[in-house]
């Protein structure tokens, strides 16, 4: 059998059904933590992971492509922590990259002071933590476990129960010490921005 045929997922096999069940358990345990990940990145990983790992029955090609997927998603998670957004002159969200001098963006800032979006130490802390959360998700993923470290599956159930609460406590501590008001790429706007947008809409309607 060629490696090309091994890249096609076998969704009807008992092993794939078991992997799907284990993955669902992992996602349930990490439900409160995956909210910290960029939505688009998480969606792409969950969509492509079963295909690229062949539901855990990997060839060399599967391992290479799965590794590339993990690397790209990891980069996306870190990169998103160094982005932010503001309300543009047309009322829509505009994104940019945070720098030492402020927010670098292609959009017209209007009256927005981009210097207040300066790079902070908290951005690096959050980037490291978000990467750790994504790494936890990858570690507990049944397809990835079967593909790269099949012997690890014996202890995976224990980690699914123990690891998410531990990471949850760490996340609460980190975000208490380093609060963030960033609403970058892949993240929903913060409550203050949502409230301001609603007030603007109400004012325009009443006018």
Swiss-Prot record:
Keyword Membrane tagged: yes
Tissue specificity comment: Expressed in leaves, siliques and roots.
Membrane topology: Multi-pass membrane protein
Transmembrane portions of the chain: 33-53, 64-84, 121-141, 159-179
Cell location: Endoplasmic reticulum membrane; Vacuole membrane
GO cellular component: endoplasmic reticulum; endoplasmic reticulum membrane; plant-type vacuole membrane
Keywords from the named record: Endoplasmic reticulum, Membrane, Transmembrane, Transmembrane helix, Vacuole
Segments of this protein annotated with the region Disordered: 1-20
Record carries keyword Kinase: no
Pfam families: DUF679 (PF05078)
Biological-process GO terms, alphabetical: endomembrane system organization; endoplasmic reticulum membrane organization; membrane fission; membrane fusion; plant organ senescence
Family: Belongs to the plant DMP1 protein family.
Database matches in PANTHER family: PROTEIN DMP1, PROTEIN DMP3
Job description of the protein: Involved in membrane remodeling including fission during breakdown of the endoplasmic reticulum (ER) and the tonoplast during leaf senescence and in membrane fusion during vacuole biogenesis in roots.
Protein name: Protein DMP1
UniProt source species: Arabidopsis thaliana (Mouse-ear cress)
Gene that produces this protein: DMP1
